[in-house]
């Protein structure tokens, strides 16, 4: 019985040694493959962003819709860099200048909650700088009222 157990133990030790050697060879191959992959990746040029970098916004209300669309498109095309609302708001702030830059300073100084809430930040911008379609909607209402008065 003891001899059978010793024989079984030797067989297990031999198998263990063979598996360790195989594991060592596989790790060696893996290291070579990782190095080869890194070498090949260095040769590949990353694709350029299909969406141009947005222009700065200085506070012209007529440009706000264009600015928001440009920044949204850019963030969608580069979403790996804009993983949360705070990153999106920080990106918008980095593109502000002039009156718009002055407007955002109190939010930054008071560490306002809108700095971490993209939609709230955009809503604040719309409220302060105006949104181009609001003026157009008012004009349409006036035209409808004039048409009703004529009939």
Curated annotation (Swiss-Prot):
Residues 132-151 are annotated as: Disordered. It is found in: Nucleus. Residues 133-151 have a biased composition (Acidic residues). GO terms for cellular component: nucleolus; nucleoplasm. GO terms for biological process: cellular response to lipopolysaccharide; cellular response to muramyl dipeptide; maternal placenta development; maternal process involved in parturition. Its main location: nucleus. InterPro entries: DUF4939 (IPR032549). Keywords: Nucleus. Pfam families: DUF4939 (PF16297). The keyword DNA damage does not apply. May have an important role in the development and/or progression of some cancers. Belongs to the LDOC1 family. Interacts with NOD2. This is Protein LDOC1. It comes from Mus musculus. The gene is Ldoc1.
């Amino acid at each position: 019985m003891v001899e059978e157990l010793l024989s079984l133990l030797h067989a297990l030790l031999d198998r263990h040694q063979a598996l360790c050697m195989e594991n060592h060879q596989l790790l060696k191959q893996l290291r070579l493959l990782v190095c080869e992959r890194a070498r090949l990746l260095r040769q590949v040029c990353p694709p350029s962003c299909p969406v141009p970098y947005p222009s700065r916004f200085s506070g012209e209300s007529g440009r706000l819709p264009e600015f928001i669309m440009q920044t949204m498109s850019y963030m969608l095309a580069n979403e790996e860099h804009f993983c949360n609302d705070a990153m999106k708001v920080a990106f918008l702030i980095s593109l502000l200048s002039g009156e718009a830059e002055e407007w955002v300073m109190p939010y930054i100084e008071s560490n306002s909650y809108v700095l971490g809430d993209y939609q709230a930040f955009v809503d604040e911008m719309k409220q302060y700088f105006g949104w181009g379609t609001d003026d157009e909607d008012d004009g349409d209402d006036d035209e409808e009222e004039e048409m009703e008065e004529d009939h």
